[in-house]
């Protein structure tokens, strides 16, 4: 299987300009290029009629998906918050704690370190 993917047929927004008729090539999990055609070695994915745009980055998130970080200051809480926000286009976020007791603040800090070490998708530290 190829390590690069070519998304064809979509209308692509790069954050400043709309690109119609171009191919978005992803390599090693990152945007590699916009081109007029798919590379020969790429897995071609039809995105006909779809829009492709950058995800949102939210730098202050107190909760999501039924989880308030103050109530669940652990890695599972962070993962559930990140997953809930991802469904609506937020691809990266910073979980923030509302002012709380010192023991909750300590648990939240420990959870952030652990989430960073384990690579929770979407978590910024």
Q: What is each PLM-predicted segment?
A:
Residues 62-64, 79-108, 121-125:
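Divalent metal-dependent hydrolysis catalytic cores, especially in the metallo-beta-lactamase
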Residues 14, 116-119:
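A generic local secondary-structure boundary/capping motif
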Residues 2-3, 40-42, 48, 52, ...:
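Short coil/turn connectors at secondary-structure junctions
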Residues 111-115:
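N-terminal hydrophobic targeting/anchoring segments and the immediately downstream early-domain regions
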Residues 24-25, 33, 58, 68-70, ...:
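Short, conserved beta-strand segments within well-ordered enzyme catalytic domains
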Residues 1-39:
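N-terminal metal-binding scaffold of metallo-dependent hydrolase/deaminase domains
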